[in-house]
Design a protein with these regions (language model features):
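A surface-exposed partner-binding patch
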Residues: 1-99, 152-160
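Short, flexible beta-strand-to-coil junctions
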Residues: 47, 92-96, 104-106, 113-118
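Helix N-cap / beta->alpha transition motif
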Residues: 60-63, 103, 127, 136
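A generic structural signal for beta-strand entry/edge sites
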Residues: 88, 107-108
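Short helix/loop capping segments that flank catalytic or ligand/cofactor-binding pockets
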Residues: 99-102, 111, 121, 141
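Compact, glycine/acidic-enriched structural inserts
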Residues: 116-146
């Protein structure tokens, strides 16, 4: 990460994209009964996890076992969006406690959920703290790539 140490006064941590050592998409399909968005399945077939602690506040996706575990533990399994309760899969988080959740139904929009309380598997956040950040999973990955680029360029505000 060019210029990181000059900007922050310490060297960057390990920022990693770890290739899958097993077909993680198949694991998710098996554990969740085949109801997972196709983009998520394809992603975890190729990537075990993404760990970017030095990009903005940090971005963390996966690993598969954590994603499946969060769903099984209902942490959360549903979110409230504009008064509707929708089923989600929590695919990651940032370093500040926000969760990234993808809707289980296609086109599978991705939401950033911040300051949420979880009761009975349903996450509820204060008004304005559940925000759709991408229309689908591939759009989320594109936005994440832009976040990495803007962080490396030293921009002031993260895109999400």
């Amino acid at each position: 990460m060019r210029g990181f140490e000059e900007r922050f006064g310490y060297p960057p941590d390990d920022n990693l994209v770890v290739a899958a050592s097993r077909p993680g998409g198949a694991v998710i399909l098996r554990e969740l009964g085949g109801r997972v968005p196709s983009g998520v399945v394809g992603f975890f077939d190729a990537v075990e996890e993404i760990s970017l602690p030095d990009v903005w506040n940090g971005y963390f996706l996966g690993p598969v076992d954590r994603v499946v575990g969060a769903y099984a533990d209902e942490s959360p399994r549903f979110i409230t969006v504009e008064g509707d309760v929708v089923e989600v899969l929590t695919i990651g988080s940032d370093g500040g406690g926000a969760l990234y959740c993808v809707c289980m139904e296609e086109p599978a929009p991705v939401f950033r959920l911040d300051q949420a309380s979880i009761r009975g598997g349903v996450a509820t956040a204060p008004p304005g703290f559940t925000r759709q950040i991408a229309p689908d999973f591939s759009g989320f990955l594109e936005a994440l790539a832009r976040a990495v680029e803007s962080s490396e360029q030293g921009r002031e505000q993260p895109p999400f």
